[in-house]
């Protein structure tokens, strides 16, 4: 199990080291527009899971939404501190 901060650190490392075959690297290379579309897709899946699926399914969908949100932040050069200042 990872914390939100640990996931961000792992994704940031992948963005820097660019391991071959990394899905995160491929997503970053696809650009902000594609990442934004993916984030919207995941948000819709969270909504549907909240209304029609189990708690476990909802938790999984939220985890995917958080992953894509973090990848988008990294693509834009933002950090979690940038977000935390707005909470």
From Swiss-Prot:
GO BP annotations listed: L-histidine biosynthetic process
Question: Where in the cell is the protein located?
Answer: Cytoplasm
Q: Which UniProt keywords apply?
A: Amino-acid biosynthesis, ATP-binding, Cytoplasm, Histidine biosynthesis, Hydrolase, Nucleotide-binding
Q: Name one GO molecular function term.
A: phosphoribosyl-ATP diphosphatase activity
Q: Name one GO cellular component term.
A: cytoplasm
Which reaction does this enzyme catalyse, per its entry?
1-(5-phospho-beta-D-ribosyl)-ATP + H2O = 1-(5-phospho-beta-D-ribosyl)-5'-AMP + diphosphate + H(+)
Q: Which EC number applies?
A: 3.6.1.31
**Predominant location category:** cytoplasm
Q: Does the keyword Kinase apply?
A: no
- According to its UniProt record, in which pathway does this protein act? Amino-acid biosynthesis; L-histidine biosynthesis; L-histidine from 5-phospho-alpha-D-ribose 1-diphosphate: step 2/9
InterPro entries given for it? HisE (IPR008179), PRib-ATP_PPHydrolase-like (IPR021130)
The similarity comment for this entry is: Belongs to the PRA-PH family.
The protein's name: Phosphoribosyl-ATP pyrophosphatase
Species whose genome carries this gene:
Mycobacteroides abscessus (strain ATCC 19977 / DSM 44196 / CCUG 20993 / CIP 104536 / JCM 13569 / NCTC 13031 / TMC 1543 / L948) (Mycobacterium abscessus)
UniProt lineage: Bacteria, Bacillati, Actinomycetota, Actinomycetes, Mycobacteriales
């Amino acid at each position: 199990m990872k914390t939100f901060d640990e996931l961000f650190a792992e994704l940031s490392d992948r963005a820097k080291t660019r391991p071959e075959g990394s899905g995160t690297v491929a997503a970053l290379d696809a650009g902000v527009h594609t990442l934004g579309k993916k984030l919207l897709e995941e948000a819709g899946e969270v909504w549907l899971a909240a209304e029609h699926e189990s708690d476990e399914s909802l938790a999984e969908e939220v985890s995917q939404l958080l992953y894509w949100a973090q990848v988008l932040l990294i693509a834009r050069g933002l950090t979690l501190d940038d977000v935390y200042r707005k909470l």
